[in-house]
Design a protein with these regions (language model features):
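Acidic/glycine-enriched edge-of-secondary-structure segments
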Residues: 197-205, 234, 395, 441-446
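Short, solvent-exposed beta-strand edge segments and adjacent coil->beta transition regions
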Residues: 195-199, 229-231, 274, 329
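Short alpha-helical scaffolding segments that buttress acidic/His motifs in well-ordered protein cores
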Residues: 215, 232, 457-460
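Catalytic and substrate-binding clefts that recognize carbohydrates or anionic sugar/phosphate headgroups
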Residues: 5, 20-22, 26-226, 236-238, ...
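Beta-strand-rich binding/interaction modules
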Residues: 2-18
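Aromatic- and carboxylate-enriched substrate-binding clefts and catalytic-loop regions
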Residues: 15-20, 60, 67-69, 258-470
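Short amphipathic alpha-helical segments
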Residues: 241-244, 402
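N-terminal small/glycine-rich loop or linker at the start of catalytic domains
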Residues: 218-235, 322-331
Length: 470
């Protein structure tokens, strides 16, 4: 059931980021009673209070799934959103980061863009109810009850605004903005930072499988990975030459160890050419012959690539000339179809044609202001930093969704180029609907400790409860 709410005279009619085009559904009825209107579907009854608009979500047999707060269950706070203008007053610094040198906007003019809402949906969860999902957090919390969760992208965080309940339902926020889940003494609500209207889906299901099935009905089926992707994938930081990669593959085979893929982590490019989508000819003189030799041993080849490109690269110059970069940055604008096609063209010409089988899409958030902190910030500080920094480059209502569009670039580009290989995209970030683009998420640059391993179990379970299987 889709629920939308606005203070304007009409709804936008837009479909949320990551959600497929809606179908017309038959089989629902409406009954008006003295104090409420009741909507019925095959599995669900929604009781809407005529005076307050508050909704109770029930099974057809009367069992309560969820109730909204009786009064003022939906709050919209209108605000002016602004976008960055690059002009003679813009101050930009180049900063060395773990993901290469990046241009950072320190000062810039801002102009009015549009009116948006901060939205807040107040809910009354049942005492014994457990809540899961919302992507991946690093704190190791499984049941999210009694906590505050800040949904923004980061190196160690994957924000997916989909919540599942032990009481048999899920809630999918139709938003591309950052968001907050709160369940404390100060209230229980779902907050979004910037939307044109409040928009969400209530998904009823008798089991977790049924809830996830409902999520994928809305956002797409998970793409099937090739069989080798479920096997052993060998990586280290890092293999430096074509000869070294072939030697490692031969050693695995000579010793009888299982090996399904080898990964070339960063610096496949020439020195000083961060993000250039081509091989360094001095270290990889014949990449096609290298992948042919690997394939003869039934070993596949994965390569890491970035959305940002050094200013010294030909790839950057091509994007700059066509004005397909995010404002004052070296990061391509994955929201623009022309930019996605150009990015894949560069991948195709410099990498894919040489037999690369899979991609390691690093830094796909693509902003990680926490790297600049000398001391680890708290969750609320990290949220504020991301909203501030990413907001200089990406519209507020799309701020969390860059990784989804980056994955779309790879999936659509490769499938158009060839249907002989299934898409495998090991990436650090994605969003609602990412499962249909062949993504495998990893949890960022974590520390090697037993405590970290313990927390990763909860992080992985909540991530899978968010609708993405890998």
């Amino acid at each position: 059931m889709r629920i939308s709410y606005t203070q304007k005279g009409e709804f936008t009619g837009n479909i949320g980021i990551g959600i497929l085009e809606e179908k017309e559904w038959d089989g629902w009825t409406c009954e008006e009673q003295e104090s409420r209107v009741v909507l019925y579907t095959e599995k669900l009854a929604l009781e809407v209070d005529k005076r307050t608009g508050s909704i109770r979500y029930l099974e057809r047999n009367g069992r309560l799934f969820l109730a909204e707060r009786e009064e003022d269950s939906r709050e919209l706070e209108e605000f002016d959103s602004y976008k960055t203008v690059i002009d003679e007053n813009t101050k930009i610094e180049e900063v060395e980061t773990a993901d290469g040198v990046k241009r950072v906007i320190k000062e810039a003019s801002m102009v009015f863009d549009k009116k948006l809402y901060h939205t807040r949906l107040h809910l009354k969860w049942q005492e014994s109810e457990r809540l899961y999902g919302l992507g991946q957090a690093e704190e190791g919390l499984l049941n999210l009850r009694g906590s505050v969760q800040y949904l923004h992208q980061a190196n160690l965080k994957i924000a997916i605004p989909f919540l599942v309940s032990s009481n048999g339902y899920g809630i999918l926020l139709s938003t591309g903005s950052t968001a907050i889940f709160q369940d404390t003494q100060y209230g229980s609500y779902l907050y979004t930072e910037a939307d044109e209207e409040m928009d969400y889906y209530f998904i009823a299901g008798g089991s977790m499988d049924e809830i996830i099935s409902g999520y994928r009905l809305l956002t797409g089926k998970a793409a099937m990975l090739p069989r080798w992707a479920y096997g052993f994938i060998q990586s280290q930081e890092r293999y430096e030459t074509q000869e070294e990669i072939l030697d490692v593959a031969r050693e695995f085979r000579d010793r009888g160890f299982g090996l399904d893929a080898l990964v070339l982590d960063w610096c496949s490019w020439e020195d000083g050419m961060w993000g250039q989508k081509s091989f360094d000819p001095s270290r990889f003189p014949d990449p096609g012959a290298m992948t042919d030799a690997l394939h003869q041993e039934d070993v596949h080849f994965m390569l890491s690539i970035w959305p940002n490109m050094s200013k010294s690269t030909a790839d950057y110059e091509e994007f700059l000339e066509k004005k397909l970069l995010l404002p004052a940055s070296e990061i391509y604008d994955a929201f623009d179809e022309k930019a996605r096609k150009l990015y894949w063209k560069q991948v195709q010409e410099g990498l894919f044609r040489h037999g690369v089988d899979a991609w390691w899409c690093d830094s796909s958030e693509p902003f990680t202001p926490e790297w600049a902190r000398k001391a680890k910030p708290g969750p609320e500080e990290m949220y504020a930093d991301f909203v501030r920094d990413a907001g200089k480059y990406i519209p507020a209502e799309r701020m969390n969704s860059y990784g989804l569009f980056h994955a779309r670039t790879i999936y659509e580009g490769q499938r158009e180029a060839s249907e002989e290989k299934r898409v495998v995209n090991l990436t650090r970030n994605s969003y609602v609907g990412g499962q249909r683009y062949g993504v495998i998420l990893w949890s960022g640059d974590i520390y090697a400790s037993w405590e970290t391993l313990q927390k990763q179990i909860a992080a992985g379970l909540n991530f899978c409860a968010s609708g993405l299987p890998y």
